[in-house]
Design a protein with these regions (language model features):
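A compositional/biophysical signature of low hydrophobicity enriched in polar/charged and small residues
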Residues: 1-327
């Protein structure tokens, strides 16, 4: 790792492209940014080797695997003599559901995003967490019940996943960057079949692809996220995709009014009237000004600003779930 390595504006633009679709080819990214294929390839490989890009991630619609609820639990860990261990926290959360993401925030809080198979009561989760961890540890609990809330904004219509669909899905979870030819070889099916299934999974809102950045490697930058609650959920159709009209307007304004920020839609909320956008910034005063302006948008009901210090993505349980459906 080079001590003097710093991201430049071109790197940030590439990060923005990968965050929206990390399976984009070097050629497509280069075409969008007026760069050569080799330039894009070199920059991406450097960001991976320097640890800036922590992980390429699949973003699944877990409703397709039978899950019904998304639950975010915010816990503030302490370092006093009687503080509980991280293992105690993880063990408790695993009894509630499967941990999809851990997000450590500036200030000492950690948000755990859980995917749960059954519908579950807010009070039940809260009381169980307080009883296990103590009231001083629990900050917030957010539940998103019903199928519609776990479906991403691109969700079109459900369909039954075949064994071949599941095998393709497993390959993509294990390696989101796997090539079509390699997947075809691994699964002993034609490249045409793999292409068709992948297109159907993406168009049906079953899978998207993004990246996770390592905040510790972003010298001079911070990862911050704005969680935006829009005023209404009237839905429009964009081709085969559905999206809240207000959400669409807000996203357009963000792109148009803040072109200096590499902006991507976060994959970790799927509610029509919520938008989670991730950004990179190096000027806290400018970030605060940007956040205040977002709050003033007429389409915005309220907004929250979060600064991430560490992100951990869990996928072992997804592989086990897919395997259980294949057996």
């Amino acid at each position: 790792m080079q001590d003097n390595y710093r991201l430049d504006k071109t790197d940030l633009a590439i990060i923005g492209q990968l965050s929206r679709d990390s399976r984009l080819s070097y050629e497509k990214i280069g075409s969008a940014l007026h760069l050569t294929r080799n330039s894009v390839k070199t920059r991406i490989r450097r960001m991976v080797s320097e640890g800036t890009i922590q992980e390429f991630v699949p973003v699944l619609n877990y409703a397709a695997l039978g899950y019904k609820t998304t639950c975010s639990i915010e816990i503030r860990e302490t370092h006093s003599r009687d503080s509980i261990t991280r293992k105690t926290i993880i063990d408790h959360l695993n009894r509630i559901g499967d941990i999809f993401l851990e997000i450590e925030e500036l200030g000492g809080s950690t948000v755990f995003v859980l995917i749960i198979k059954e519908s579950i009561d807010y009070d039940k989760i809260r009381s169980a967490t307080v009883n296990t961890l103590g009231p001083s540890f629990l900050q917030n609990v957010f539940l998103r019940n019903s199928n519609s809330t776990i479906q991403p904004h691109t969700y079109m219509k459900p369909y039954i996943l075949t064994n071949t669909d599941l095998r393709v899905l497993k390959s993509l979870v294990l390696d989101p960057q796997i090539g079509i030819a390699e997947m075809s070889k691994q699964l002993s099916v034609s490249a045409r079949t793999v292409n068709r299934i992948l297109a159907r999974l993406k168009d049906g809102g079953i899978i998207e692809f993004s990246i996770i950045l390592n905040p510790a490697a972003l010298k001079g930058y911070v990862i911050f996220a704005v969680l935006i609650y829009v005023n209404e959920i009237e839905v429009i159709k964009k081709g085969s995709k559905r999206e809240s009209l207000a959400s669409h307007k807000v996203l357009q304004r963000l792109h148009n009014e803040f072109p200096e920020y590499p902006l991507w839609r976060g994959p970790f909320t799927g509610i029509d009237n919520e938008i989670l956008v991730g950004l990179l910034g190096n000027d806290l005063t400018a970030i605060d000004s940007m956040f205040r302006k977002v709050q003033s948008f007429e389409e915005v009901n309220k907004a929250e600003l979060h600064i991430f210090t560490k992100l951990v993505h869990h996928k072992d349980w997804v592989i086990k779930e897919i395997d259980s459906r294949l057996n």
